[in-house]
Amino acid sequence: MSTLGHKSDNSLVSNAFGFLRFPLNFMPYDSDAEWVITGIPFDMATSGRAGGRHGPAAIRQVSTNLAWEGNRWPWNFDLRDRVNVVDCGDIVFNFGDAQSMSDNLQAHAEKLLAAGKRMLSFGGDHFVTLPLLRAHAKHFGKMALVHFDAHTDTYANGSQYDHGTMFFHAPNEGLIDPTHSVQIGIRTEYDHDNGFTVLDAAQVNDRSADDLLAQIKQIVGDMPVYLTFDIDCLDPAFAPGTGTPVIGGLTSDRALKLVRGMQSLNIVGMDVVEVAPAYDQSEITALAAATLGLEMLYLQAAKKTK
């Protein structure tokens, strides 16, 4: 026999249904999954180049390049041996209706969290993090935010809602505590008086990863953490396929070292956003996003014993 029902598929190009070929489960609330992958194909809140709606599909497609590895380096264990993950596909919302997306995503997240699941989400533009934060704050209370980005996304913009204002609204709604939150890789204009600790790109590139991680852990403390990674945190040399690229960013190696070093944080939710494959070269941006998502899952699995 030669279908997925009868054998494992190790091809790098076929059967890219779920992220990393994790099983698809469109009713994940009733499953035995611990972590649920959700795609959010939304880019209506984008200020510059659109195309993030195609991000989840691109990330899933390129993730087949990562699915073959069992005892992944440098973790030296197989993720599947320690944590049960399913991909529930993409959220459904009314085309052209941003409120529908926000409401449906928040309701989906609330139902998953109430069922004892945790979420790794793929955007989509960065606005999608706001309804995710609302759901997670209802379940876990006020959280710390660990935020990788070229932009702080704390701009008021007349109090409008877009992919650059989520972290202006989130503290005002009581979802996150800026004094226990860190923004990493910033290299654009920002308000220095909003309470967040900003580790700008120059610091992150020049200081040791161990030094940075010690500071991050001190700031975050024991609070529940929401981890969000805007792919434009990476330098465009490593992630050209995004809507608002900014030169002078992190290397993929530096980003991986920082993410891998966050094992002691109490991470309760995670996302990777702003992949716009129309501007990508050789799928390197999608591959970076897929790899970061995989490393985030390994970060959780590493806390568990066999």
UniProtKB/Swiss-Prot annotation:
Q: Which CDD domains match?
A: Agmatinase_PAH (cd11592)
Q: Name one GO biological process term.
A: spermidine biosynthetic process
Q: What pathway is this protein a component of?
A: Amine and polyamine biosynthesis; putrescine biosynthesis via agmatine pathway; putrescine from agmatine: step 1/1
Keywords assigned: Hydrolase, Manganese, Metal-binding, Polyamine biosynthesis, Putrescine biosynthesis, Spermidine biosynthesis
Catalysed reactions, as listed in the record: agmatine + H2O = urea + putrescine
Top-tier EC class: hydrolase
Gene Ontology MF, one: manganese ion binding
Q: Which cofactor does it need?
A: Mn(2+)
Recorded E.C. number(s)? 3.5.3.11
According to the record, the segments passing through the membrane are none
Which positions are annotated as binding Mn(2+)? 126, 149, 151, 153, 230, 232
Tell me yes or no: is Cytoplasm among this UniProt entry's keywords: no
**Would the keyword Hydrolase turn up in this protein's UniProt record?**
yes
Against InterPro entries, the record matches this protein to:
Agmatinase, Agmatinase-rel, Ureohydrolase, Ureohydrolase_dom_sf, Ureohydrolase_Mn_BS
Q: Name one Pfam family in it.
A: Arginase
Q: What does this protein do?
A: Catalyzes the formation of putrescine from agmatine.
Which family does the entry's similarity section mention?
A: Belongs to the arginase family. Agmatinase subfamily.
Q: Which PANTHER family match?
A: ARGINASE/AGMATINASE, GUANIDINO ACID HYDROLASE, MITOCHONDRIAL
Task: Identify the HAMAP family for this entry.
Answer: SpeB
**Listed name of the protein:** Agmatinase
Its source organism is Serratia proteamaculans (strain 568)
Q: Taxonomic classification, please?
A: Bacteria, Pseudomonadati, Pseudomonadota, Gammaproteobacteria, Enterobacterales
